[in-house]
Curated annotation (Swiss-Prot):
Protein name in the entry: Small ribosomal subunit protein uS15
The organism's taxonomic lineage, starting at the top: Bacteria, Pseudomonadati, Bacteroidota, Cytophagia, Cytophagales
Family to which this protein belongs: Belongs to the universal ribosomal protein uS15 family.
Gene3D superfamilies: 6.10.250.3130, S15/NS1, RNA-binding (1.10.287.10)
Keyword tags: Ribonucleoprotein, Ribosomal protein, RNA-binding, rRNA-binding
Subunit structure of this chain's protein: Part of the 30S ribosomal subunit. Forms a bridge to the 50S subunit in the 70S ribosome, contacting the 23S rRNA.
GO biological process, one term: translation
Coiled-coil annotated residue ranges, if any: none
Natural source organism: Cytophaga hutchinsonii (strain ATCC 33406 / DSM 1761 / CIP 103989 / NBRC 15051 / NCIMB 9469 / D465)
HAMAP family: Ribosomal_uS15_B (MF_01343_B)
Length: 91
């Protein structure tokens, strides 16, 4: 499996607001987890171009991440800018 519990804990530890492995609810940690999953699905779709169900799942993940980024932008712009810079996302 590409997303083990150890990988999730590491993502949460490096990107969460509390900087702990149990910080799963903050928008930053969720955005980082979605970004990891999006990167994995993008690589999968480069090989399997006709996998339309995965393509649909990828679009849903991108939408969820976009909504979280919009929420973070409206509430705390400094945290939004930090996560954009940290994950190398483009607006």
């Amino acid at each position: 499996m590409y997303l083990t519990s150890e990988i999730k804990k590491e993502i949460f530890k490096t990107n969460g607001t509390a900087k702990s492995a149990t910080d799963t609810g903050s928008p930053e940690s969720q955005i980082a987890l979605f970004s990891h999953r999006i990167a994995h699905l993008t690589e999968h779709l480069k090989v399997n171009k006709k996998d339309y169900s995965t393509q649909l799942g990828l679009m849903k993940l991108v939408g969820k991440r976009r909504r979280l980024l919009n929420y973070l932008q409206k509430t705390e712009i400094s945290r939004y800018r930090a996560i954009i810079a940290q994950l190398n996302l483009r607006k």
